[in-house]
UniProtKB/Swiss-Prot annotation:
The protein, known as: Probable glucomannan 4-beta-mannosyltransferase 2
Gene: CSLA2
Presence of the UniProt keyword Transferase in the record: yes
Catalytic center residues: 182, 335
Entry GO terms, CC: Golgi apparatus; Golgi membrane
């Protein structure tokens, strides 16, 4: 009997009442229907059809099979996985924008507080040191200072750092200049040694030190330098990389913070760049590093008295180094390693942005890639090695542990490099080809816009470069993500160390001899970066699909990304040496 008004009951078919897959642009038939031939007419009717009428139906049925299966795979496998990736990226984006907002507000508060009461630490000007030409017993307020200059085949810049260090204003009997030369080129070693001898002839207390091997790289050189008897007599150590040129009053400005505040272990100063206007890539680097110093270092110093040591242009208290275990070479970020360990011992750090030290930015794409790999991979690897040590530490507060684990390491050193590439270069382009997945506008537009605005606020003079900065950083995100994963997983390349190439002058043509060996014709192929070009092809496919068949309208952004990856894939970024 029927249950709907006496109508005869019918046997319920297992076929669905509507197509299994429905999108905003096209409806697909159930993928199993062609196998069962459920759409075929009865045998008698099929026999009555003319041949011309039956052939198109067979062709349509066979041609719909691949499309049906592709739609099924997309809807049942790709879409759920992509949707999960979208929400994971949105969660990480929220973490990143919250961290950026917190750091931005803290840095603005630090800037306001500095105008009212300075840096919050006692600082008193030092008495004039004795004349270098007529040495006299130095006042007791001038402690022994060691100036370390580690270098490795620095033919282009070794004179800059040595000359600047020897010109520092400090009693000559209270300062020691230590040049740590790990050069493997005998000619360069001879040049550096002759330069040290020349300054020694001018009554400068300078020491030239070499090692039999490069074990530990920079960390090993610094550690070996501290083992010398004369170095153990020093109370403080200033460190400058080979391309850094401190002003003569550097010690007179930084040392009072250390002398009058015994809890301070490190005074970090800001980098200034002599070659930032060489090319677009160096201008973009300056934007990123200015944000790093103005926001990350300033907020860390103001809120937590902690930040990552930048490896150069800073002055350390020797007792803090010794108490923290000295220099370790377990990662490629020995500077950050020492800073974290010193912080866990209760030491405080101070960032003084008013003191600037001239330095050089890498101007070739290859050199910049190596530098970013070392920094990103080393930081992620240090997170892996020190996470449990931070958790179990009993000498610092829970608030500082939270800052170290979550803000300093997890968000900035792990989430940031992975999210930028995964979300903006993989997930968003792929979603343009999957209409079942929609990204909320707040995650697609509002969050990246907020991050860009916060960066622009602290770099008002570089607002016109923001579009180029976004595209460049997204391309570099691929290398940073690979480096971060390499560090987190501690792969074979986790401890690769490549010294950043330096040129020593903004204009090479003004020099009598070339600073770099001309590239051989076969080496020109090294300018082609296959990963960038492959990703450019992927982005081009996604953008073209969205333009022709899609409805997300992401193609403008994706096309721009494809252009950026193509340009950098062929090496058309930074300075270039012509092929011979």
């Amino acid at each position: 009997m029927s249950t709907n008004g006496g109508a005869p009951s019918q046997k319920r078919s297992w076929l669905p009442s509507r197509p299994l897959l429905t999108t905003t642009t096209q409806t697909y038939p159930p993928p199993l229907l062609p196998f069962k031939k459920l759409h075929a007419p009865p045998t008698a009717a099929r026999r009555s059809l003319p041949p011309a009428a039956s052939k198109p139906m067979a062709s349509s049925s066979s041609s719909s099979l691949p499309a049906a299966w592709a739609a099924a795979v997309r809807a049942w496998a790709v879409a759920p996985a992509l949707r999960a990736a979208v929400w994971a990226c949105l969660a990480m984006s929220a973490m990143l924008v919250a961290e950026a907002a917190w750091m931005g507000l803290a840095s603005l508060a630090a800037a306001a507080a500095r105008r009212l009461r300075g840096y919050g630490y006692r600082w008193e000007p030092m008495a004039a040191p004795p004349d270098v030409e007529a040495p006299a017993p130095a006042p007791a307020e001038f402690p022994m200072v060691l100036v370390q200059i580690p270098m490795y085949n620095e033919k282009e810049v070794y004179k800059l750092s040595i000359g600047a260090a020897c010109a520092l204003t400090w009693p000559p009997d209270r300062i020691i200049i230590q040049v740590l030369d790990d050069s493997t080129d005998p000619f360069v070693k001879e040049l550096v040694e002759l330069e040290c001898k020349e300054w020694a002839s001018k009554k400068i207390n300078i020491k030239y030190e070499v090692r039999n091997n490069r074990k530990g790289y920079k960390a090993g050189a610094l550690r070996k330098g501290m083992e010398h008897t004369y170095a153990q007599l020093c109370d403080f150590v200033a460190i400058f990389d080979a391309d850094f040129e401190p002003e003569s009053d550097f010690l007179l400005k930084t040392m009072p913070y250390l002398l009058h505040n015994p809890k301070i272990a490190l005074v970090q100063t800001r980098w200034e760049f002599v070659n930032y206007n060489v090319c677009l890539m160096t201008r973009i680097q300056k934007m990123s590093l200015d944000y790093h110093f103005k926001v990350e270092q300033e907020s860390g110093s103001f809120m937590h008295a902690f930040f990552g040591f930048n490896g150069t242009a800073g002055v350390w208290r020797v007792s803090a180094i010794n108490q923290s275990g000295g220099w370790k070479d377990r990662t490629t970020v020995e500077d950050m390693d020492l800073a974290v360990r010193a912080s866990l011992k209760g030491w405080e750090f101070l960032y003084v942005g008013d003191i600037r030290v001239k330095s050089e930015l890498p101007s070739t794409f290859q050199a910049y890639r190596h530098q970013q790999h070392r920094w990103t991979c080393g930081a992620a690897n240090l997170f892996r090695k020190m996470a449990w040590e931070i958790i179990t530490n009993k000498e610092v507060s829970m608030w500082k542990k939270y800052h170290l684990l979550y803000s300093f390491f997890f968000v900035r050193r792990a989430i940031a490099p992975i999210l930028t590439f995964l979300f903006y270069c993989i997930v968003i382009p792929l979603s343009a080809m999957v209409p079942e997945v929609t990204i909320p506008v707040w995650g697609l537009v509002y969050i990246p816009t907020a991050i860009t605005i916060m960066n622009a606020i602290r770099n008002p003079g570089s607002v016109h470069l923001m579009p180029f900065w976004i595209l460049f950083e997204n391309v570099m995100a691929m290398h940073r993500m690979r480096a971060a994963l390499s560090g987190l997983l501690e792969t074979a390349r986790a401890n690769d160390w490549v010294v950043t190439e330096k040129v020593g002058d903004q204009v090479k043509d003004e020099l009598d001899v070339p600073l770099l060996e001309p590239l051989k014709p076969t080496e020109c192929a090294e300018r082609i970066y296959i990963p960038e070009l492959l990703l450019a092809l992927y982005l081009l496919i996604c953008a073209s699909y969205d333009f022709v068949l899609g409805n997300h309208k992401y193609y403008i952004y994706i096309y721009l990304q494809a252009v950026a990856f193509t340009v950098m894939g062929f090496g058309f970024v930074g300075t270039r040496t012509p092929c011979s």
